[in-house]
Amino acid sequence: MKVYLVGGAVRDQLLGLPVKDRDWIVVGADPATLLSLGYQQVGKDFPVFLNPKTKEEYALARTERKSSAGYTGFICDFSPTITLEQDLIRRDLTINAMAQSEDGEIIDPYGGKQDLENRILRHISPAFSEDPLRVLRVARFAARYHSLGFKIASETLALMAELAQSGELQHLTAERIWLETEKALNEKNPEIYFETLHKTGALSVLFSEIDALYGVPNPVKHHPEVDSFIHTMLVLKQAVNLTENNPILNKSAVRFAAICHDLGKALTPQNILPHHYGHEQAGIKPTRSLCKRLKVPSYFQELAELTCEFHTHIHKAFELRAETVITLFNRFDVWRKPQRFQEFLQVCLADTRGRTGFETKDYPQIDYINQLLHAANEVDVQQVIADGFEKQAIKNELTKRRILAVKQTKTNYPTN
């Protein structure tokens, strides 16, 4: 029986990156052997065991043979005669198919180290096409390692495009698509994930609402980048900058809202382009459709829909009437969900800066709207009750006093 460290731990170690999870492969053993050594079996689909001391996962070396469509249609063989090389070749990319022996030797039968040095994401064998989930995984790795200079090999991109056209992607469950996508949203360059999926044709299959933005023009005066898909990717990049060092915000929810904020632009009638009157309200339906299909968590969906509907309100914050401001606060339920409103404001800032040449633009609207929010929050509900108001009258009086507080703050707010 031999044990090897495999996959991501070896890859990241060679890249000089911190190793998060360590996976191990056991060659020349069967389940009975590991159980006798005190390992605990946890895998249902294939034998995975927890080390009694470290609690790290140890899997028996295995081979896989495609038996039906999708990413679950495989027949596995876990016999003790399976070699390390046979196990490694079933993996997706060469850089993920290296192993390290217990004495520290790197075993690299498929050129992963060379591809690591050359910054290339390359599939190992034609068997790559047997698992459609790999299209998303490779796009996610491209997003993760883009800042280190990694590119996807042209032949791998071609295989990904073939998979996108084959109909195999339709066999992916909503849960798996969303899991990969949420992971991608938390990478350093999530825009690369979506750009890669667009390049391979997978975006139109899995995220048609986002893909529909491609080629939709905006007025060049406000959007020198013109294209709505390019703008959305620039907004996503800005959202990353604004959230990566902010532990309070829900990073992936903010980034998802950034992607959805302009989905309504894909529905703009041709005869009024490049203007997009009413795109805010129009964006709610495609956002809802996307979220329902992919079973996106409700928090993400709510923030994305509200962002679609109200992002231009913040751009025009200085023009809003006090009544409109309170209606906005009520729609966001800022009284009970203050963080969600702050996350929304970050998307609005990302939207302003996600335009070519506007990357460092000041956005005083956030300070202004937060001052109005502070004033509205200062209104004491207990005082309203103490003043003798009851039931619905409490809510009506509270709204009146909040509107008055906002009006006073607007009047006193410095305009220069």
Curated annotation (Swiss-Prot):
List residues binding CTP: G8, R11, R91, R137, R140
Specify which residues bind ATP according to the UniProt entry for this protein: G8, R11, R91, R137, R140
Per UniProt, the cofactor note for this protein states: Magnesium is required for nucleotidyltransferase activity.
Enumerate the Gene Ontology biological process terms: RNA repair; tRNA 3'-terminal CCA addition; tRNA surveillance
Q: Care to name a GO molecular-function term for this sequence?
A: tRNA binding
> Record-annotated residues binding Mg(2+)?
D21, D23
Task: Please give the PROSITE patterns that the UniProt record associates with this protein.
Answer: HD
What is one Pfam family matched by this protein? PolyA_pol
This protein's UniProt keywords: ATP-binding, Hydrolase, Magnesium, Metal-binding, Multifunctional enzyme, Nickel, Nucleotide-binding, Nucleotidyltransferase, RNA repair, RNA-binding, Transferase, tRNA processing
Q: Where would I find the HD domain in this sequence? A: 228-335
Reaction catalysed by this chain?
Answer: a tRNA precursor + 2 CTP + ATP = a tRNA with a 3' CCA end + 3 diphosphate; a tRNA with a 3' CCA end + 2 CTP + ATP = a tRNA with a 3' CCACCA end + 3 diphosphate
What cofactor does this chain's UniProt record say it requires? Mg(2+); Ni(2+)
Q: What is its EC number?
A: 2.7.7.72, 3.1.3.-, 3.1.4.-
| Further facts | A single active site specifically recognizes both ATP and CTP and is responsible for their addition.
Record remark: domains:
Comprises two domains: an N-terminal domain containing the nucleotidyltransferase activity and a C-terminal HD domain associated with both phosphodiesterase and phosphatase activities.
Q: How does it assemble?
A: Monomer. Can also form homodimers and oligomers.
Its biological purpose? Catalyzes the addition and repair of the essential 3'-terminal CCA sequence in tRNAs without using a nucleic acid template. Adds these three nucleotides in the order of C, C, and A to the tRNA nucleotide-73, using CTP and ATP as substrates and producing inorganic pyrophosphate. tRNA 3'-terminal CCA addition is required both for tRNA processing and repair. Also involved in tRNA surveillance by mediating tandem CCA addition to generate a CCACCA at the 3' terminus of unstable tRNAs. While stable tRNAs receive only 3'-terminal CCA, unstable tRNAs are marked with CCACCA and rapidly degraded.
To which protein family does this belong? Belongs to the tRNA nucleotidyltransferase/poly(A) polymerase family. Bacterial CCA-adding enzyme type 1 subfamily.
Q: Please report the name of this protein according to its UniProt entry.
A: Multifunctional CCA protein
The protein's organism comes out as Haemophilus influenzae (strain ATCC 51907 / DSM 11121 / KW20 / Rd)
Record lineage: Bacteria, Pseudomonadati, Pseudomonadota, Gammaproteobacteria, Pasteurellales
Q: Which gene encodes it?
A: cca
